[in-house]
Swiss-Prot record:
GO terms for biological process: translation. This is Large ribosomal subunit protein bL17. Keywords: Ribonucleoprotein, Ribosomal protein. Pfam families: Ribosomal_L17 (PF01196). One of its GO terms (molecular function) is structural constituent of ribosome.
Length: 127
């Protein structure tokens, strides 16, 4: 299996990809470098495919990878607050959205290079 090292150790790279994948699932659009985006595309598509499967084993596999972060907070009419995590958003919002799609859930758009070091920057978003 080939992958990009991204100039980091194995554990740092795994943490970076977990964070970026979780941020992409929560915000549905992030700005990052081209190399990172191409790696995140792979993991994000795997997570959405797990979400589409929807069984208990898929939920546990996704929970092992996606960070436990708050995706949204909503107030109900009776003054109660509903907090939705990134994992809940994946299975309840994103999976039904892509139910009829067989892959290609992300899009990478090139933008201007980063000002400090000229690194190629992109916007990666969910289609």
């Amino acid at each position: 299996m080939s992958y990009r090292k991204l100039g980091r150790t194995s554990s740092q790279r795994k943490a970076l990809l977990r964070d970026l994948t979780t941020d992409l699932l929560i915000n549905e659009r992030i700005v990052t470098t081209e190399a990172r985006a191409k790696e995140v595309r792979s993991t994000a598509e795997k997570m959405i495919t797990l979400g589409k499967r929807g069984d208990l084993h898929a939920r546990r596999q996704a929970a092992a990878y996606v960070r436990n972060e708050i995706a949204s907070v909503e107030e109900q009419d009776d003054n109660s607050v509903v907090v939705k995590s990134a994992l809940q958003k994946l299975f309840s919002d994103l999976a039904p959205k892509y139910a009829d799609r067989k892959g290609g859930y992300t899009r990478i758009l090139k933008t201007a290079p980063r000002r400090g070091d000229g690194a190629p920057m992109v916007i990666i978003e969910l289609v």
